[in-house]
Amino acid sequence: MELDYAPAPKTWSVGEILDHLILSDQVYFREIKALFDLKREGKPTYLRRRFSDFNPSVFFLPKSALPYLDESFRLVNLVLPRSLRTFFVLSRLVPTDAPDIARPRPGRSGDAIRQELAAGPVALADLFAGEPEADFNQFIHYHPLLGENNLYQLLTFLTNHETVHQRQIEDTLPKIKR
């Protein structure tokens, strides 16, 4: 099936790329919900995540070393401008592997992927509709690679992340054997 065709070893098929986007969105939708829950509980609306929460792979650093580098990355994020972090995300110059929680599930059906892709924007709209009076600048999510982001910035990251993978799909499609 074309959806499952990966053009080379250690590359993703179009289906896997789409599934990764689904899983990534679900992770961040849960993070946004957690921030809204903090507000409802009267707590500070700040989530600080660590490498151990996501277990990503960055550069050529072993995954097992990343939890020990949380503080180092925090310091880098204090001085690295957001525009440069965005450039690194969009350019794919910094090699990363998907975190375990967003690693695609091979062999999913096209129907299942389509249904989940269609459900994502609705789920996100429902999340924000539940907080009509909220100041989204006041909800802060910290990620060791992305630094501190309010909800507007987090949504911009999700858009940029999707753009990267749309390009990946565009690169993959011509390589599919028909």
Give each language-model segment a name:
Residues 99:
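Residues forming anionic-ligand binding surfaces in small-molecule and nucleic-acid pockets
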Residues 113-116:
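A short, structured beta-strand-centered segment in the mid-to-C-terminal lobe
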Residues 4-55, 72-96, 118-178:
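Short, contiguous alpha-helical
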